Each structure stands twice: as structure tokens, then as C-alpha cells.
From Swiss-Prot:
PANTHER family attached to this UniProt entry: D-AMINOACYL-TRNA DEACYLASE 1, D-TYROSYL-TRNA TYR DEACYLASE
Catalytic reaction annotation: glycyl-tRNA(Ala) + H2O = tRNA(Ala) + glycine + H(+); a D-aminoacyl-tRNA + H2O = a tRNA + a D-alpha-amino acid + H(+)
HAMAP family linked to this entry: Deacylase_Dtd
Complexes and interactors: Homodimer.
EC assignment: 3.1.1.96
Protein name in the entry: D-aminoacyl-tRNA deacylase
Entry function: An aminoacyl-tRNA editing enzyme that deacylates mischarged D-aminoacyl-tRNAs. Also deacylates mischarged glycyl-tRNA(Ala), protecting cells against glycine mischarging by AlaRS. Acts via tRNA-based rather than protein-based catalysis; rejects L-amino acids rather than detecting D-amino acids in the active site. By recycling D-aminoacyl-tRNA to D-amino acids and free tRNA molecules, this enzyme counteracts the toxicity associated with the formation of D-aminoacyl-tRNA entities in vivo and helps enforce protein L-homochirality.
Protein location: Cytoplasm
Motif (Gly-cisPro motif, important for rejection of L-amino acids): 137-138
Keywords in alphabetical order: Cytoplasm, Hydrolase, RNA-binding, tRNA-binding
Molecular-function annotations in GO: D-tyrosyl-tRNA(Tyr) deacylase activity; Gly-tRNA(Ala) deacylase activity; Ser(Gly)-tRNA(Ala) hydrolase activity; tRNA binding
Length: 149
């Protein structure tokens, strides 16, 4: 699994002109799922993201996690995070998991996050979405279950 995690003041996602998910202070997570992902990757990514110390403490240092600040979470599926641009000019997405298998992994990730976070909002899996993000900082972190970065 691969995620782009952005600290936000607010974020929302729309489908067909309707807001389907919206949060205030928290994290916007763009989540990509690989054909190689396993069940333990879901727990690893959830724990890593929810406990990333990317919120400021009283001294202005990045010492607090989403859980510490009781922030909100917006999770959006993003298969293009597995786009491979090494050959040619058109990305290849053969490493991205698709269809119902990907939807199942995405939903399991959401369910695990809901066990810890009071407000979890989501995009619509497989839909064409308009995502509005008001970055805070900006603070943007990439997380990968294969630990390649």
C-alpha cells in the first residue's frame, strides 16, 4: 500500500457536484493499493498514518499525531499512486490492484481507521472525484508498506 498523507485545515471530496466527504483539522490520505499487498499491510499503514507525529505541540515542534490532536481523517482511493513512468510517457498501472479486491482492501482500511478516529470521511471508490485540500504547513508525507521511502 502507498499513501500520500497531507496535514490539512480542511478538505472535501465531491462526486457529481455533491460533497460526499468533508473534514476540518486532520489528515487527507490518498491511498493506493498494490497487487502485492497483504492483510498485514492494512494494519501497518493504519498504525503508521494515525501515529505520524506531524502536528505541532505547544512549542511548535512536530510531536503530535492525529490521535493526539483528535483530528479528522479523509481517505480517498488513488490507484494512480502505483503509476510506473519509467518507460515511455504513459504511466503503467499494472501494479495497482483493481476491482472488487481493491474495494475490499480499501474498505478494510477505512474500518480499521474508524476504530481509532472519531470522524472518518471517504471518497467514493472508483468514482471521478473533485478533491479540495487546504494544506496546513504544508506538511505532506509519503508512506509505503514496502518501506521504500
Amino acid at each position: 500500500m502507498r499513501a500520500v498523507v497531507q496535514r490539512v485545515k480542511r478538505s472535501k471530496v465531491e462526486v457529481d457536484g455533491k460533497i460526499i466527504g468533508e473534514i476540518g483539522k486532520g489528515l487527507n490520505v490518498l491511498l493506493g493499493i498494490s497487487v502485492e499487498d497483504k492483510k498485514e499491510d492494512i494494519s501497518y499503514m493504519k498504525d503508521k498514518i494515525l501515529n505520524l507525529r506531524i502536528f505541532e505541540d505547544e512549542e511548535g515542534k512536530l510531536n503530535k499525531s492525529l490521535l493526539d490532536v483528535q483530528g479528522e481523517l479523509l481517505i480517498i482511493s488513488q490507484f494512480t499512486l502505483y503509476g510506473d513512468c519509467r518507460k515511455g510517457r504513459r504511466p503503467s498501472f499494472i501494479k495497482a490492484l483493481g476491482g472488487e479486491k481493491a474495494r475490499s482492501v480499501y474498505n478494510e482500511f477505512i474500518d480499521q481507521c474508524k476504530d481509532s478516529v472519531h470522524n472518518v470521511q471517504t471518497g467514493e471508490f472508483g468514482a471521478d472525484m473533485l478533491v479540495s485540500i487546504e494544506n496546513d504547513g504544508p506538511v505532506t508525507i509519503m508512506v509505503d508498506s514496502e518501506k521504500i521511502f
